[in-house]
Amino acid sequence: MRPLACCLVLVLAAPGLAAPRASSAVARSRTLEQELLGAVRAVDFTPVLDWRRSGQRLATPPNLDVAVIELDAEGRPVAAANVLLSRDYPRGRVVPLEPKRWGTRAVRFTRWDPERWNGKKGWADAGPEEDLVPGRASAPLRFMAPYPASLFKILVAYGVLRMVDQGELTLDTPYHFTSGQEDRGERPVRGWMDPMITESNNGATEALVKLLHERGGMARLNAELAALDLGTLQVNGTSPVTGRGWQPGSIHMTALDTARLFLLIDGGPGLLWKTTRGREVTAATLSEPSRAFLKGLLAEQGFAEGLSSTVICGDPNARPGLPVAVPARFLDAEGRATVGTNVFGRDTRPCNAAAQVEFLHKTGQTENYGSDAGIVRALPGQTPRHYVIALLSTLGYRYYDAGVAPSANFQDEENGFPRVVTGIHFTQTLAELGHRVDEVMKQRGAASAESFPHFDKAP
């Protein structure tokens, strides 16, 4: 992968707001659009360095897809905004959204193609076979959707929990996993789900992908998501033998659809959105026990990085991000985080003590791609805000900031990336973006609290 493409989405819940009329939703959306556009424009991606280009700056502007859906006190959508930033839209572009759907048909999303990204193919000549959703050839905007990396594990979790809800298995159903000829042992389904979400464990993900194939869930997953108008969320090409086969250009997610999936997981009452075919989507698409289980795992996800920076708390190269705490299960007595095999080595206690929100989320990162998405909720006593934020990008660990540049070794293909030496996995532009978006939502929450005195009361 070459330059970067990122995609971010966010959904805000404002306790105390009443469900809006269509006209007020449009008005709130207009202000949210401009605030979100301003947050994106305020982040300077031009100084980001590229290990694959021997530490040179980015060759082109990054792709950034940001969407926000604001919610009322109980979690009903009241406003939405979506902004694209790319080499096509270097100053950002607001995406037209459809009220009540909180979706868009104004963007032609195409599958990720590394050769198109790095210039070996034409940037603008993708054929209809590359469309993620058909029928958008004449859409006014276009965007090549970055590979979601381990963020796609939320789709695997959704598929498994749909099978649980349909009575095809339970969270305590034992599953013995063999990958080809390799025996990986037996655990209950929940025993595979936990490490897949909280530590982003690939082996656990392989087990659940294979389970979905064996039980017919994988064959249904894309169709079920498409029926919810989440058609850009797709898992294709995985192996029914090993559970692997996770490839760019085959597994797809976009920010707005990712945010709406997290909106569903969050579980507000009543109508969440209406599909183009008139289906009314509610939180009951996933049962309350399944949503509660998944939210519990997301709350315990250990990688407080990407849109936040708590795992590298106190590092001179860290920038403020979403003000979250690292789950205690990953901390030693000195507050240092170890998540799976990732040792971060910083005392996170000062940042944990200063946390303002909890973040129920899933991250993902490879060399070429980085992502982070989840549900943000204000902690007690903090300025009320409640939203979902989703970021999908090509800002993988090959991209880094000037402060860690001395650690880069361009002759060492395995250990020469700055992340190996510093433990700073993401460019801090993403944490800065998380911080700026949270400040927008914090200000909107404070304004709503003034208008509605019960705003900060738990519903």
Where are these regions (language model features)?
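Bacterial N-terminal signal peptides
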Residues: 5-15
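Structured C-terminal helix/loop/strand segments within mature extracytoplasmic catalytic/sensor domains
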Residues: 20-104, 264-459
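Active-site-adjacent helix/loop patches that line small-molecule binding or acyl-intermediate pockets
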Residues: 59-64, 68-73, 184-293, 297-301
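Extracytoplasmic
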Residues: 59-66, 80, 143, 147-152, ...
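Short, charged, amphipathic alpha-helices and their helix-cap/turn boundaries
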Residues: 88, 111-130, 215-237
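Intrinsically disordered, low-complexity acidic Ser/Thr-rich regulatory segments
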Residues: 114-146, 335-359
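Active-site SXXK
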Residues: 146-175, 389
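Short glycine/serine- and small hydrophobic-enriched flexible loop segments
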Residues: 158-166, 210, 260-267, 435, ...
